[in-house]
Amino acid sequence: MCDSKDNSGVSEKCGKKFTNYPLNTTPTSLNYNLPEISKKFYNLKNKYSRNGYGLSKTEFPSSIENCPSNEYSIMYDNKDPRFLIRFLLDDGRYIIADRDDGEVFDEAPTYLDNNNHPIISRHYTGEERQKFEQVGSGDYITGEQFFQFYTQNKTRVLSNCRALDSRTILLSTAKIFPIYPPASETQLTAFVNSSFYAAAIPQLPQTSLLENIPEPTSLDDSGVLPKDAVRAVKGSALLPCIIVHDPNLNNSDKMKFNTYYLLEYKEYWHQLWSQIIPAHQTVKIQERTGISEVVQNSMIEDLNMYIGADFGMYFYLRSSGFKEQITRGLNRPLSQTPTQLGERVEEMEYYNSNDLDVRYVKHALAREFTLKRVNGEIVKNWVAVDYRMAGIQSYPNAPITNPLTLTKHTIIRCENSYDGHIFKTPLIFKNGEVIVKTNEELIPKINQ
């Protein structure tokens, strides 16, 4: 842990400077510009009284109006300071999470008095009452930066008053009073960052180029299996641990040791089949692409998102507040349909019009998503094979003069109505050429 004199000064124990993220800034990608308050767990103190019930252990407050006297000792005696990280949402608001238990601040719907709500500790769900706007400015005398937290309706701010129990009611809401010069009520609603712990954040990988479809080198060369295929990193995103289900870690351990998870998006050429087709012969081959329902459900459970029928990303409530940052980092679009991508099974008839036997290997583009912990351990990965981008390589590729011809195409099964596209036949596969097809059906657009 490091201590700091103020928000922009030198860390006394660490001997290095750190800069606070400017307040009221436009949303930015988690990948490249994490604000300081999203990279550290800060202990918060009140600006004027310097007490921080449950948020810091400091001197007894000398005078606090509108707080019952029996709450003074509770605030003073608490020796369990809280260290809080603020996860930046797409809209510029924050989720305030506790390093100790992995829970987040939640504005409970019940009332205390004067239309004020208790702020409780709760598991993250993505609801509006867990989102807070941080606003503030600097003290022109001391240069110290302080701030308030606005609640969802922007008519209340977080207050240190009414903190009755360190694990039930953390804070409460209060009316908005001028932050400077301070009203007496502002003593408990204006906060400053104090000492901190660094968050556990993984390194982002460099992107790379996708290689050409691999070629067979002999009739006996069946090609590269999917598990051995060369991957190209096309994007990556940092996922706040509050949206990730890690079967091996509880919320507290996730927050401390994997504050952010790494989600990598890779592409590779997925072998669909490899076969020697005799001269002037037709063969039937079954091809399986897309993604299974079991794999989609796994992605929903662990990431609260899935791959749409248009191969874009679809987000549920828990992850939707971060969807712009995630898709920007992954270099993937938002899905324009609520329909999930399903598994597609087709029967193809191919004709070899050459005068010699030929080894043909067909590949389709695979889109792979891998979830990793800070230490690089893989939690899980999900693969969707895109039937719309495919190509065939052959051996020998000379002296053959005639390409492989798709003479008949039948869909055996497709798990959603948007996978019903049939290739027009005959379709010529030139050696090494990638055929790109898109659905002819109009997929209805939605607003995520």
From Swiss-Prot:
The keyword Disulfide bond applies. GO terms for molecular function: toxin activity. Gene3D superfamilies: 2.80.10.50. It is found in: Spore, Perispore. Residues 19-200 are annotated as: Beta-trefoil domain. Disulfide bonds join 67-161. Keywords: Disulfide bond, Sporulation, Toxin, Virulence. Transmembrane segments: none annotated. Residues 226-407 are annotated as: Probable pore-forming domain. Processed by proteases extracted from mosquito larval gut. One of its GO terms (biological process) is sporulation resulting in formation of a cellular spore. It comes from the Bacteria. Component of a binary toxin active against Culex and some Aedes mosquito larvae. This subunit is responsible for localized binding to specific regions of the host larval gut. The individual subunits are not toxic. BinAB and this subunit alone bind to the gastric caecum and posterior midgut of C.quinquefasciatus larvae. Binary toxin internalization into host gut cells requires both proteins. Does not bind to the midgut of Aedes aegypti. Toxic to Aedes atropalpus mosquito larvae; mortality towards both C.quinquefasciatus and A.atropalpus is maximal by 48 hours. Belongs to the toxin_10 family. Forms a heterodimer with BinA. Has an N-terminal beta-trefoil domain and a C-terminal pore-forming domain. The trefoil domain has barrel and cap subdomains; the cap has 3 possible carbohydrate-binding modules while the barrel is involved in host cell receptor binding. This is Binary larvicide subunit BinB. The gene is binB.
